Amino acid sequence: MTVIGIDLGTTNSLGCVYRNGKAELIPNAYGSYLTPSVVSMTEDGKLIVGQPAKDRLITHPERTVSSFKKDMGTGRSWKLGEKSFLPEELSSLVIRSIVEDAQNYLGEEIEEARSEERRVGKECRSRWSPYH
């Protein structure tokens, strides 16, 4: 059973897998360990997550949202195009993106993803360095 850890951050998120007693960072589809916690909706209704969404913050601010994690549990919603999303829904899109990247990187299906802020987040962050 493959289990990954996810550090869901306000600005960036990342995933890791435990192998041989160590946390191994999982690169996203763009080769980076950090995935921006940003979601955007194209004009035709397609949802985009991560770096491509972040790239749209300037060109499509009305269809792109970031920093939504801090509003989880408040009931605040964000409008992308014609649809409204709760921060929990937007966060789930970021998590789904990291799980898909992990499946592609590891070549196997992910059966469980855990986001335990203190334990998993600390371990993932301790393995991350801007020099990777």
What do these predicted regions represent?
Residues G121-H132:
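Positively charged, low-complexity/disordered segments
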Residues M1-P36, M41-R119:
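N-terminal phosphate-binding loop and flanking beta/alpha elements of the actin-like ATPase fold
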